[in-house]
């Protein structure tokens, strides 16, 4: 397996694939998608600024995907940007013939896999962090596992959760709902999950300190030692 770090402006990813050619295909697709989005934002800057659902005015495919997913979750389109870019990259890998490919875009993961895949949990100072992993079954079509945190990383959040991970067949949907739920979940209260019915989300897990809240169909969680050196990171210029 090849593991590649790839950064293009604020898009900072780790790509896993069996062949270098598939990594290059993913890079090209993500660059093109990001450039399409940048050109659109240049003529419609409100798309980037709003924290509420927004309908693009003749936007490119990436903007439409982001807005559609975010609208369902009740958040602004940029809440789905990382998952959408990752999904576009993995989709390109699949069309090129890859049966296995993973793109981790800052904790928002799109993937296809022909084998069980372990995904480690990093949740900041939570006692669970770095000690547990999800075991995802094979996924022949593009799938999303996206995480949002109020205590880790630079992303804007109005919540308190150390990590909220969402599973969905559409990574854009997983990303948008991870953001929305991270804004809403609170210790000892699980009502934030009530809005997930019919959303396209398969399952969700919220970690708040030592508390774990679950909803829907969640892959098995097993003990693991998560190598923090493998967490996607980079420098922004």
Curated annotation (Swiss-Prot):
Which organism does this sequence originate in?
A: Methanosphaerula palustris (strain ATCC BAA-1556 / DSM 19958 / E1-9c)
Q: Which Gene3D superfamilies match?
A: ApbE-like domains (3.10.520.10)
What's the protein called, per UniProt?
Answer: UPF0280 protein Mpal_1292
Family under the similarity heading: Belongs to the UPF0280 family.
Query: Which HAMAP family does this entry report, sorted A to Z?
Result: UPF0280
